[in-house]
Amino acid sequence: MDTMGRHIITELWECNPDKLNDIDYIERLFVDAALRSGAEVREVAFHKFAPHGVSGVVIISESHLTIHSFPEHGYASVDVFTCGDRIDPATASQYIAEGLDAKVREDVKLERGMGPIRVPEAQVAISK
């Protein structure tokens, strides 16, 4: 194994604001994303803010998936971190982006735990 973990930091823009503000939808989306990527879900915690926004985490045996949503801006900040090489964090990240109807997606992929972090250029996908 070349790395102890893989981390995808995802910026999602022009998302469906109703989905970004629906705690039940986001929780299901994140649990499904974890399961689709082959992860084992351990704990789930989500919080709905007033007047809008959701933050949450799905703890998986292999690490975690998190979100902070800003429906008023059509924006979500998503992290998917997986230890080892059995789970592909890109599968979960893509599923989440599609589930939130993101029109613009920016990913930064990091390898973790093997020395200094090398931060690559962000990869931007626009689906307008």
From Swiss-Prot:
InterPro entries: AdoMetDC_C, AdoMetDC_fam_prok, AdoMetDC_N, S-AdoMet_deCO2ase_core, S-AdoMet_deCOase_pro-enz. GO terms for cellular component: cytosol. Binds 1 pyruvoyl group covalently per subunit. Pfam families: AdoMet_dc (PF02675). It catalyses: S-adenosyl-L-methionine + H(+) = S-adenosyl 3-(methylsulfanyl)propylamine + CO2. The active site is at S63, H68, C83. Its EC number is 4.1.1.50. Its cofactor is pyruvate. One of its GO terms (biological process) is spermidine biosynthetic process. Catalyzes the decarboxylation of S-adenosylmethionine to S-adenosylmethioninamine (dcAdoMet), the propylamine donor required for the synthesis of the polyamines spermine and spermidine from the diamine putrescine. This is S-adenosylmethionine decarboxylase proenzyme. It comes from Exiguobacterium sp. (strain ATCC BAA-1283 / AT1b).
